[in-house]
UniProtKB/Swiss-Prot annotation:
GO molecular function, one term: N-acetylmuramoyl-L-alanine amidase activity
Domain MurNAc-LAA: 32-201
Keyword Hydrolase: yes
Protein name: Uncharacterized protein YqiI
InterPro entries linked to this entry: MurNAc-LAA_cat, N-acetylmuramoyl_amidase_3
Gene3D superfamilies reported in the protein's UniProt record: Zn-dependent exopeptidases (3.40.630.40)
Gene name of the record: yqiI
Family: Belongs to the N-acetylmuramoyl-L-alanine amidase 3 family.
Organism: Bacillus subtilis (strain 168)
Domain of life: Bacteria
Key words of the record: Hydrolase
GO biological process, one term: peptidoglycan catabolic process
The keyword Amino-acid biosynthesis is assigned to this record: no
């Protein structure tokens, strides 16, 4: 009888531990499309000696690396300085059957404008897109300590026509000297990338 109880106890322990041992990270295996805005002859916003296209690409590369570390399958719209149409960006995400679409940008405006904002569009996967935008925005503001300009709805092409939850993050204002100093820093770019991935993690953890 003692042996029987010991066997039952061991079986119970094994059943308790098995789900933990086998549990995968929620993001593991997900295909996440990372879109570095602009590129090539399209420099995007320009300010304080910086080009938006370069910042977008640098952050995108850090995001891609971090996603790989977490077992996701990141797909980048571009890995170098070349031009892609908006239609090509959306088509590539669809061709790769992406689970999420995250477009990375920096903003421009009057010199006093600063801060971070994240956009979604509600026509397709609206609630999931809003939730993803909220999670990424929250992580960006917390990590970067930027002014929180909020989560907003807009009809940017890439988030309107992508057939999966889609967001567009504006990391800061290239035309604001304080924001620009940070945006041009590799350390800050890495922090922004980590925050974006943490936002994606939060989205899948819910």
């Amino acid at each position: 009888m003692r042996m029987l109880w010991r066997s039952l106890a061991l079986c119970g322990l094994a059943l308790t531990l098995a789900p933990c041992a086998q549990a995968a990270e929620p993001i593991e295996g997900k295909t996440v499309y990372i879109d570095a805005g602009h590129g090539g002859e399209d420099s995007g916003a320009v300010g304080n000696g910086l080009f938006e296209k370069d910042i977008n690409l640098a952050v995108s590369e850090h995001v891609t690396d971090k996603l790989k570390e977490e077992g996701a399958n990141p797909v980048a719209s571009r890995s170098d300085d070349h031009f892609l149409t908006l239609e090509e960006r959306v088509a590539k995400a669809s061709a790769n059957q992406a689970d999420l679409f995250v477009s990375i940008h920096v903003n421009s405006g009057v010199a006093s404008a600063s801060g971070t904002e994240t956009y979604f569009q509600s026509d397709y996967e609206g609630e999931n897109s809003r939730r993803l935008a909220s999670d990424i925005q929250s992580q960006l503001v917390s990590s970067l300590q930027t002014r929180d300009r909020g989560v907003k709805e807009s009809d940017f092409y890439v988030i309107t026509y992508s057939q999966m939850p889609s967001v567009l993050a504006e990391l800061g204002f290239i035309t604001n000297s304080s924001d620009a100093d940070k945006l041009g820093s590799e350390e800050y770019q890495q922090k922004a990338a980590d925050a974006i991935v943490n936002g994606i993690d939060s989205y899948y953890d819910q």
